[in-house]
Amino acid sequence: MGHELTTEQASEQFILEGFEPWKMRRTATGSRSKLFVAMKPPWAMAERIFTDAADHAAGRTRRKAYPTELLHITLVGIGGFQAIPHGLINRLQTAMEDVQARPISVTLDRSALFGNRNSLALHNGGGLPAISSLAAMIRRALRRRNLPCAPQQSLTPHVTTIYGCGKIDLMPIRNPYCWLAGDFELVFSHYGETRHESFGRWALLPDADDYPQTAAQLDLYAPEAA
């Protein structure tokens, strides 16, 4: 995802009574494709992020910047799968129609090292509570329809720019990355192919209710200070 599922999260998949058990291996997370709900930056912004990350990676790590078309902020992880779970996806698509939420102003003004593999990511130093609220709304929509998602965790919205780079210098942010997020989508990330397949995109509506002002914004991965 951006926040990609951790090994523990992705290996835990709910098998719901009355539903066909979706074919999923309970082995290492890295051997499975991932299904998640995310928002992606506009193409021009994603290109700018990629270019800056690629420049930063040069001479610092052998890892390459994450491709433009794959940059995202994960909202909710669904699980890891051996094959595309079409039946589940149909149910998820129906649930996503229930989500009525406003567009979100996104600003990424800091970099940090996230996750056990020390991947480089962009985030907001003051938090992005509206994104946390949107993620909570999506989870509620899934629960109402008895659909699975990864165990609920606190959320630090972020865009991972270089995966598995180790403890490299943080990327300086001279001009914050800002955009208005107008939709979210259901994404299947194909393992080993560096490819996302979208299974639907849902608009955020300007006339929807405001997000709560007290959404908790807790660090999930305890990023280092930029």
What are these regions (language model features)?
Residues 1-226:
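Histidine-dependent nucleotide/RNA phosphoesterase domain, centered on the 2H-phosphoesterase fold
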